[in-house]
Amino acid sequence: LMKICDIDISQFNNQSNRYTTLKRSKLIEFFLKNIPSQKIFFNSDLIDINNQAKISLKFRNKESEEFDYIVAADGVFSKTKQILFKKEGLPKYFNSIALRGKIRDFENSDISLYLGPNFHFVIYPINQNKEFNFISIIRKKLIEEEMSNRDLFNDNTFIENLLNQISSKSKFNLDEKVEEIKCFPIFVSKKFQIPTLKNIFLTGDAFYSFPPSFAQGASQSIEAANDLFNDLENNSSNYYKKRILKTKQIDSRSTLNHFAFHLSIH
């Protein structure tokens, strides 16, 4: 295992821009508190999309709604994308698994990146209470039977084996340090897919899901939302053109990082 860097992000701050790290759940809480509750409909199961004079959405409860525009930000397994592109809208397994957990009282208050053979992990602060996020990406091939077993990723023995795989090549005893550990298989997009129906916009992971080795997920979602806002405000049609160009750049860097981070040095 090799520690590659400490990043003090405060050095990039100025009077108008400040960089920070935070827990994803806290960001979601912030948004939910600031969006009127009557504008959010939970447990809406989309089953069909039709484009007539307006875009018509049909839901599992047999209700339907019409819209001028649809912005789909429903994640890696986007239901919108699967309706539009059928099986071609499904992502593929990246032969990697992510571990996410929490560490208390870590000795370094900066962002720390550690590289090892076939894995890497990042530790970064999420608040002023000496709590840190731990995120690791581990190369792991799975057979079809394992992929279809959703209980596998909640199995304590499976998760402990992954932690031991890292700990055995690290100076950290991660078993004792990492709390609230969770495990996720990583899926990425197969290719770019642009809806033929007018005024339907895919954004975030619903548009394209990257290998998670460039810390780009949230930043690209925010950037894409800004691009789309400007596109609609100016009545232009450059959104997908700009997104594909930028996404190709980010995807190539992320794929290269994933390869470089997991190199074995003998």
Model regions: which residues?
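Conserved catalytic motifs of the protein kinase core domain
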Residues: 66, 131, 198-199
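Histidine-centered metal-chelating micro-motifs
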Residues: 77-78, 98-100, 119-122, 207-208
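Conserved FAD/dinucleotide-binding core of flavoprotein oxidoreductases
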Residues: 6, 13-19, 23-24, 28, ...
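FAD-binding beta-loop-beta segment adjacent to the flavin cofactor pocket
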Residues: 184-211
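C-terminal helical "tail/cap" subdomain of flavin- and related membrane-associated enzymes
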Residues: 168-175, 193, 213-220, 226-266
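Conserved N-terminal helical subregion
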Residues: 1-85, 89-102, 143-145, 155-156
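Conserved beta-strand termini and adjacent loop/short-helix elements that scaffold enzyme active sites
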Residues: 43-45, 60, 116, 137, ...
